[in-house]
Amino acid sequence: PILLIDHHPDPEIKTDWLFSDINVSSTAELVFHFLEETRLISYLDKESASMLLTGIMADTGSFSHNADRPATYRIVSRLIEMGADKERINTLLFNNFSEKRMRLLGHCLSQKMEIFPSCHSALMWLSKEELKEYDFHHGDTEGFVNYPLSVKGIVFTAFFMEMSNYIKISFRSKGNFAANEFS
């Protein structure tokens, strides 16, 4: 049997059981709820608590989005009480990048970002040649799609990345704009 735990709407994976809630911050938060409901939470050790906190922090951009429910912070508090080190996780997730990754981000923001003020949207793209030029490694562009949301008035962004045999597309939004309607 296959159990799928996910916080995204309408997962495409075929499964026997689906545990889903689009109102939570992250899949990690759902896993925490699942462990509570199945009374397995007492088996959570420091390492497992750290993994769940990492998932919550990654999916919320260190609590900058998808983190408006007090229940999320209660879970974070419990994970910290179990030994998860929030500062260490934050450093590893958000302050641990290579120079080439930072230069790729700079190139993307300065040369490859288009702003469409009348649509409150932004678009970014990178070609496979640019990825090669900046010695791209899997994960180097993680979070790039979020940066245009920092521009005043922008509520939707799309990031296109040309891979060897497909184009990877990421969408993000803020406020009441539902990016998942595009995917």
Q: PLM features: residue spans?
A:
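Short alpha-helices
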Residues: H7-I75
